[in-house]
Amino acid sequence: MGGLSLLQLPRDKFRKSSFFVWVIILFQKAFSMPLGVVTNSTLEVTEIDQLVCKDHLASTDQLKSVGLNLEGSGVSTDIPSATKRWGFRSGVPPKVVSYEAGEWAENCYNLEIKKPDGSECLPPPPDGVRGFPRCRYVHKAQGTGPCPGDYAFHKDGAFFLYDRLASTVIYRGVNFAEGVIAFLILAKPKETFLQSPPIREAVNYTENTSSYYATSYLEYEIENFGAQHSTTLFKIDNNTFVRLDRPHTPQFLFQLNDTIHLHQQLSNTTGRLIWTLDANINADIGEWAFWENKKISPNNYVEKSCLSKLYRSTRQKTMMRHRRELQREESPTGPPGSIRTWFQRIPLGWFHCTYQKGKQHCRLRIRQKVEE
């Protein structure tokens, strides 16, 4: 009893203390005070709400939708590797979303695939859908395949980026790049951040000589497209091909093309001549990380926003170029059911969307900061 008496409070003080305890509990429930601190480099959504995005969204002009290419994450961009990331499904309607700005792609793709009966595998592009405007290399592939489904989707849940439109499906005969859509939150909206396109613009942006960004085309033939095992042939001319059986770079294919022409190894008959690659040949020549030395727009889109920490890459030495590793096996991912790292960087969890009068309204979810 003596021990208990030390813990007891006078009745009036007990009422005051319990009152303040309940006030603190209700206050925490109402304002969602963070009960922990960030002790490592891993940020949770609730922690980012408090520590990263503290600015209030004053206008929708502060939100900028940007297309981010997957090749910036180091995925293999050769045709045999890329086609393994795409697959056919039925019963899922395609979805299209617009975006305001994007990167210049090093690798784009253009597919025209037919079924064995001669019908088309891929749907034509809807009105208003044009090809991705900035491509260094366009991989044009023709061929046949079972195409077991209505549409070709991305197996990792990414988008196919077209000209300021991103779709979940591949359209026939249109240049596209693989990517995702992110939303940048600018502290203050600036008119110069995203310049509006001219009223009249060329259908093919790459024809604009002022861009200093020439586009090169590589042609392929694919057999059994959409199946687990497919064959990819690099086209030298109408009768000369090279079988591609491992990851490679666009620069390697151009060098291979020049070598075959130089040594006059073309087919001299009406039949097909198919070459195979020597196992000792290095197929990743010239593959410097394009995002470190490619030509960019004169106006660098650099803004300090509350999402800057999310898109900050690992620290690297300046004035250095690094080779991208192209191996048969991709880097290990998380446990089954996890999301790819490049997909986790999309801050979709910070926007709260509601439907009012048949229209969708989205706003940034900002937790109020408790004044000390």
From Swiss-Prot:
Region called Disordered, residue ranges: 320-340
GO molecular function: channel activity
Pfam family for this entry, one: Filo_glycop
Site annotation Cleavage: residues: R324, E325
Superkingdom per UniProt: Viruses
Glycan-bearing residues: N40, N204, N208, N238, N257, N268
GO biological process, one term: monoatomic ion transmembrane transport
Cleaved signal peptide residues: 1-32
Alphabetical UniProt keywords: Cleavage on pair of basic residues, Disulfide bond, Glycoprotein, Ion channel, Ion transport, Secreted, Signal, Transport, Viral ion channel
GO CC annotation: extracellular region; host cell membrane
Disulphides: C108-C135, C121-C147
Family that this chain belongs to: Belongs to the filoviruses glycoprotein family.
Protein name, as recorded: Pre-small/secreted glycoprotein
